[in-house]
């Protein structure tokens, strides 16, 4: 415990944040200097790198997403294999920064989400929500020699929350403003928004998932290119097509878009089975491949904007929207969102000097630091939890 106490007493810490998102394309690793604690925390990004998964690793991860191929044996094995990969990424990042593991105080690892069940299931008299992230933190701690904080989401779920979104706590620390109301729109595999009312407290923050981000677009692109492309770089394919308005209207009837916040979603809803059905309908309608990419890109854009129109604009006058995540590099997608929000300034993380790719890795570095501080680091209004909790399990 002396080791934890030494870290606790430090006013300035070096923390590595690790993130592998729903796209499962690699590990985002950020080296962060964290000063202070609580809502007055100050953060400086010192180093960042993305470590892409080898094709074989990504294939094995995707097998875990499907209940038909994700056996207990495979999950058990991949939990430890991913722990090795997370540790390796950490050590490479530290070396790149010209430091040694002894210079680092903490690691905050999100892990890899394998399955997420945000809605209650009645079973044996219990109402149960659940979520599963792998990438064994004990392996990370063992290989690096660094205290590792991980498995954040389960504590929020245990308190009745959906275990997501978690980034709003850190977004309040980093982006809040006394002068303007800001909507932070992350577009990773799934899209999610955080609204920071001007001059508001952390209790005023609202956040929820808006629907698919890059997930459906990526899967459609893989299929129409027969695996030659994994995503639509710069939105180039979508820019060649025309949105099929009839099909888009059908897609927007999905029940998720009607749900009120707090709400979360994931690959369980908008993953392989969803795209299987989507491709069948597109084939029946004889939709051109470029038109199809344009249409599913519009699905993401429209789901974002409609979420604002239903759940944000009636209550807040948003001054600007800041888009982050991999979707911020999709020029066609960003342009679609801008076109539908002419009354709001729409910019990207890069426009304000932040790194879209690093954002979530930085967030888990901050959350880990707050775990050590013993501070609440969820926002119940965003996740639906009954009360604030300290998220994160510690491996020494």
From Swiss-Prot:
Pfam families: AnmK. The keyword ATP-binding applies. CDD domains: ASKHA_NBD_ANMK. Pathway: Amino-sugar metabolism; 1,6-anhydro-N-acetylmuramate degradation; Cell wall biogenesis; peptidoglycan recycling. Its EC number is 2.7.1.170. GO terms for biological process: 1,6-anhydro-N-acetyl-beta-muramic acid catabolic process; amino sugar metabolic process; peptidoglycan turnover. It catalyses: 1,6-anhydro-N-acetyl-beta-muramate + ATP + H2O = N-acetyl-D-muramate 6-phosphate + ADP + H(+). ATP binds at residues 21-28. Keywords: ATP-binding, Carbohydrate metabolism, Kinase, Nucleotide-binding, Transferase. One of its GO terms (molecular function) is kinase activity. It comes from the Bacteria. Catalyzes the specific phosphorylation of 1,6-anhydro-N-acetylmuramic acid (anhMurNAc) with the simultaneous cleavage of the 1,6-anhydro ring, generating MurNAc-6-P. Is required for the utilization of anhMurNAc either imported from the medium or derived from its own cell wall murein, and thus plays a role in cell wall recycling. Belongs to the anhydro-N-acetylmuramic acid kinase family. This is Anhydro-N-acetylmuramic acid kinase. It comes from Caldanaerobacter subterraneus subsp. tengcongensis (strain DSM 15242 / JCM 11007 / NBRC 100824 / MB4) (Thermoanaerobacter tengcongensis).
